Amino acid sequence: TLVLKQDGTLFTAFDNLRHANIDTMAQVKVFRPDPLTPLNQVYGGIYIDNNDANAPWMNAEYWMDSIRVRYDTGTGLFYPENELVKIDDIESPTAAPVTPAVPAFLYDRSQSGFEDINALYHITRFHDYISSLGYDSLMNLQVVVDTHAQFGADNSVFNRNGGNPTICYGTGGVDDAEDADVIIHEYCHGVSWSANNNGNFSTERSALDEGLADYFATSYSRSINVNRW
C-alpha cells in the first residue's frame, strides 16, 4: 500500500502481503532416546558431556528421521515449529531457534539446533501416539519450548502460563533437551494439566504428577530403544 502526499510524492509504504505458513516434512537427526541407552552404557569415562562436544562414539547413535516443521514462503526458511510445538527463546542463555533454508535439521549436539529439533521431534511423536489412541484432546494446542533455558541450571520445568503453556529445558550438566526421558517427562506435566486444568496444585497431586510423568517418559523411551531396556 502506498500513501502519497498531496503533491503526489511518496509519504510511506506498507507491505500488506500475507505470506502463507505451510507445514512440511523435514529431515532431522536426533537421539533415540539418548546416546547411552542404545549402547547399554552408563555415564562416565569417555561417555560424558564434555561441555557439549561431539565425540566419535556418538556418530553411530544419531538417528535420521523426518518430522513436521513450518515453512514460511515469505522468508523462504524452515522453522522448528508445527501445530504442537514452537521452539522459541524464552529464558537465558540466549539461543535463537535455528531456521535453515532447506528442509534439513541435521545438527550434532555441539550445535544449538540439535536440541531444538530433538525436542520438537520427540514431543510431536509422543503427542501423535496418544492422539492415535483417541486422546486427541490432550495438549491439543501449541506449546512454546525453550531448549536452552533455566539460566544454565540443571533443571527443566513445565509452566501452565495462564493457559498458554511453556516448557523450559535447562543446560546445566548434559543439556536436558538431548534426552527423550526429560523431554517427555516435562511434556507429560502438560498432558496431565490439560486433562484436569488447575487440578495439579496440591502436594499429593503434584507427587502423583511426577510419578505419572516418569512412567510415561520411561515407557516412551523404552518403546523407541532398539534394546528395549
Q: Which residues are covered by each model-predicted region?
A:
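Zymogen propeptides/activation segments of proteases
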Residues: T1-I183, G190-W229
